């Protein structure tokens, strides 16, 4: 007995056979897909069915019932063949509604269609700020699982050098590296999907990142406070703590005084009102010693109650010089409630001091560019998923409300075995060749310039099948770009310092007035895929402001594991067991509703009469009739 529940209502249905098609990733088609669907069903236009469909067959009634999806449950003899499917009213012919339904596995692909990676909420996490202190923290972290990062590489902008066994990294144009594992988690969360699989738990997957060219950083500052001195200040020795700290007194809405207690009563440290990144700019209008002879060294900078900031000071050797308009900047992260002051002291001798005039202390809050449209290039999610599935040979199998991502090796070598020998009826069709492949199959990445593609050719590979029936060649390409073959090498440095070369920028040099001006032109939308790799090399991380920050290790972008030769060896090694002298069989089996209910495409079917194990691709099921099963022999 066939039962069809549409939006929870038992539909009137004639007990006629109809086909329910079940299929998974077609191993003869490199483009991954999965969907299970019914053929057209003719439902009588009874009062019950007309009510289910909102009387859509009455043109005078305003209704969108014909243009929406319906929840579908399909039972045979009380056994659920499909639960939570989605159905559509296709039309009406005579006294029958034409209805079709599908497994909700299609919803993932429908969800991905038309969506861009830039639309994912939470794509930019706390690690996504291009700040030297943030990048230093990332570099020293040993756990970046599901977090974005900044990876050291040669992006074509001359931002990296090696001197004396130390990387010098200018981060001005460094692109954001996006955790691919986190992207999948965000899709699952937003789409209310459940993704599972050993591959998704692997270190390989958690180490995988993507990054795009054509990014724009545009940090903005908002002025918080500008304070100035109004007198000459004798700078005291460093041991006099209370006399080396300078605070602020509000004169009016537009004016703050910089001085210290007790000379000026009421001065107080600046209290941070909102957590975030701040920049302090200090200008010393004039600095000189207070003695006609001797030498001294003055220090100036900031002090914070936040232990992660502490005191940040710069030295100024005075001697007999008078210094004018000395300017320095300090960047740091401050929490709400932190207190900030200015510090000035004399470091060397008690009897030689320093005098400063016209000091300006400016605090700005830095608002990072969180406009994802300028930080990340366009990338359709459907293309991203398709590329990832193709790179890793993944088949997503939907069962019991969950998507489990299986690699080809898992399906061929680890899937549970089911014995259908007793249900075998006959072979309906046997094919000995797969026209979806060729004698030579090229697995390719995109190239920066097709005419110079040989400069990136080492990332491509090929697979051969000995079958004279096949065409000579087919190309299978993914949407990611490969790096250059040759890595960036540094003079007087070992190969341990070599970096991947990715052309995110092109270098342009122009000679103007006898001087060479260098600019870097952004390339558009070049997505790359790579792994993060920890390299224990000292690194100085620099931006356009202040001194660099030193770290003892750094994360670098490594594409080695994404060479197609590596991918074919790791994820496609079992393809030969299917396609060397293939036997693609469509056979009839006497399957009942319990067989269909218990069946999983993550299975290997054993058929004694056919002499071995088979990987299932498609099943055409009709209640009360034999089922057609398309499968390929595992050699």
Predicted regions span which residues?
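Short, surface-exposed beta-strand/strand-loop-strand elements in extracellular ectodomains
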Residues: 293-308
């Amino acid at each position: 007995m066939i039962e069809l529940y549409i939006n929870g209502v038992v539909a009137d249905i004639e007990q006629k056979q109809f086909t329910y098609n079940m299929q998974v990733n077609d191993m003869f088609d490199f483009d991954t897909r999965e969907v299970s669907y019914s053929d057209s069903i003719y439902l009588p236009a009874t009062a019950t069915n007309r009510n289910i469909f909102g009387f859509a067959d009455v043109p005078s009634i305003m209704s969108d019932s014909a243009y929406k999806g319906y929840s579908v449950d399909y039972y045979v003899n009380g056994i659920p063949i499909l639960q939570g499917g989605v159905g559509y009213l296709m039309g009406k012919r005579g006294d029958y509604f034409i209805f079709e339904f599908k497994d909700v596995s299609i919803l993932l692909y429908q969800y991905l269609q038309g969506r861009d990676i830039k639309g994912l909420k939470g794509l930019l996490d706390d690690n996504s700020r291009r700040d030297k202190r943030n990048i230093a923290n990332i570099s020293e972290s040993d756990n970046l699982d599901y977090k974005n990062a900044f990876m050291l590489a040669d992006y074509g902008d001359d931002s990296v050098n090696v001197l004396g066994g130390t990387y010098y990294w200018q981060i001005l144009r460094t692109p954001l590296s996006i955790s691919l594992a986190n992207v999948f988690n965000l899709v699952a969360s937003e789409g209310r999907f459940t993704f599972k699989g050993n591959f998704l738990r692997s270190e390989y997957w958690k180490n995988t990142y993507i990054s795009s060219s054509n990014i724009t950083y545009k940090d903005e500052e908002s002025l918080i406070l500008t304070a100035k001195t109004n007198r000459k200040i004798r700078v005291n020795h460093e041991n006099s703590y209370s006399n080396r700290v300078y605070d602020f007194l509000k004169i009016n809405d537009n004016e703050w005084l910089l001085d210290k207690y007790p000379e000026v009563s009421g001065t107080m440290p600046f209290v941070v009102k909102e957590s975030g990144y701040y920049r302090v700019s200090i200008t010393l209008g004039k600095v000189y010693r207070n003695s006609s002879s001797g030498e001294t060294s003055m220090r100036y900078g900031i002090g914070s109650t936040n232990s992660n900031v502490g005191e940040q000071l710069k030295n100024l050797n005075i001697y007999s010089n008078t210094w004018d308009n000395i300017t320095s900047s300090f960047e740091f992260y401050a929490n709400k409630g932190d207190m900030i002051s200015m510090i000035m002291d004399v470091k060397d001798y008690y009897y030689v001091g320093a005098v400063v005039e016209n000091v300006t202390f400016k605090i700005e809050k830095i608002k990072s560019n969180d406009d994802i449209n300028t930080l990340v290039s366009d990338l359709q999610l459907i293309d991203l998923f398709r590329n990832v599935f193709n790179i890793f040979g993944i088949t997503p199998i939907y069962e019991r409300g969950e998507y489990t991502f299986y690699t080809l090796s898992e399906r061929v070598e680890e899937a549970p075995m089911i014995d259908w020998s007793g249900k075998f009826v006959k072979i309906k069709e046997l094919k000995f060749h797969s026209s979806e492949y060729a004698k030579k199959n090229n697995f390719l990445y995109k190239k920066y310039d097709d005419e110079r593609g040989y400069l990136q050719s080492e990332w491509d590979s090929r697979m051969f099948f000995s079958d004279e029936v096949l065409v000579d060649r087919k190309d299978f390409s993914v949407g990611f770009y490969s790096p250059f073959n040759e890595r960036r090498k540094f003079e007087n440095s070992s190969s341990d310092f070599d970096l991947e070369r990715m052309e995110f920028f092109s270098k342009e040099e122009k000679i103007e007035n006898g001087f060479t001006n260098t600019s870097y032109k952004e390339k558009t939308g070049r997505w790359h895929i790579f792994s993060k790799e920890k390299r224990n090399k000292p690194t100085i991380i620099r931006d356009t402001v202040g001194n660099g920050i030193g770290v003892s290790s750094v994360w670098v972008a490594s594409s080695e594991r994404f060479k197609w030769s590596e991918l074919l060896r790791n994820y496609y090694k079992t393809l030969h067991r299917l396609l060397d002298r293939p036997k693609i069989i469509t056979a009839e089996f006497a399957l009942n509703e319990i067989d269909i209910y218990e069946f999983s495409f993550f299975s290997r079917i054993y058929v004694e009469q056919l002499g071995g194990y088979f990987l299932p691709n498609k099943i055409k099921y009709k209640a009360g009739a034999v089922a057609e099963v398309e499968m390929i022999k595992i050699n």
